[in-house]
Amino acid sequence: LRGILQLTCRIAGGEFPLMRFGVLITTLLAVLAISARAEVVRVASLSTVMADLARDIGGERVEVVEIVKPGMDPHIFEPSPGDYKTISNSRILLASGLGFEGYLEKLRPVLEKSGVRLVVGGEVVQPIEGACEGHDHSGDHGHHHGNQDPHWWQSVTNVQLVAHQIRNAFIAVDPEGRETYMKNSAILDERLGDLAKWVRLQIVQLPKKNRVLVTSHDALGYFAKDYGFEILPVQGISTSEQPSSQKVRDLIGRIQERGVKAIFAESIENPKVLGQITAETGAKPGGVIYADGLGSGEAGTYEGMMRHNVTTIVEALK
């Protein structure tokens, strides 16, 4: 940049008069482009959902780099040295929290040293506990299971709260962009409100006795709590937890007892026993849902993912 400015001064001083006007204009545009680029807020994200929200809120003022990408299993993901470098070169790091990123504490020294602002979605939502086998999420419960459910994005209300959190973080590091962030956030908030209404209109089509979700792992607790479903997960909170043979037998019995119509696979990882459970219970495959983050195609955005999941669930359980 310094070299460009020095050459410009020489041209402006008359050394190259024929080039003066054109080069001055070109140089000015280059300097403005470089300056504008320097103002872009670099955001690293450990959550595909939060990355999507960040793009909607930040627009052209932010550059979002996904450390955890669609299709990855975030339960077993570990950041590489290259990921550490990407994070340390960012202004903001987005994380789900509530134990979803088991390595997050190891990242904190890197964040503090580099001055990276950490935004943890789980800090602004009301966490629920992971489900016991056959646990009903349709109401509030006073007992605890000892582990919090980190899949807060399965509630649209929670996502609205986290979107506001991201907006506030952007304003804190880039006050000049406040108007842009507020405007984009308001537009997103309205869309999420419309999404929440749409979800409820779909769910009311299901008789309450049909609102039983058999899924690969316990990731739809917030969805179940919002819309009155019972969850029968094959695995626990994490995809790395393998069910015991006793749990599988108990689950088969519960599914048969409740007359469950469909069993749902997940987009990332499914336990081998899922096929066995489907065969022994006579329940049909209900389709694939996205539990741990976004996918591709129609599920490549948060709104698209929720619409896909809800449509899949309602069609299978009618």
Predicted regions and their residues:
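Bacterial N-terminal signal peptides
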Residues: G22-A33
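Extracytoplasmic metal-acquisition and chelation regions
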Residues: A38-K318
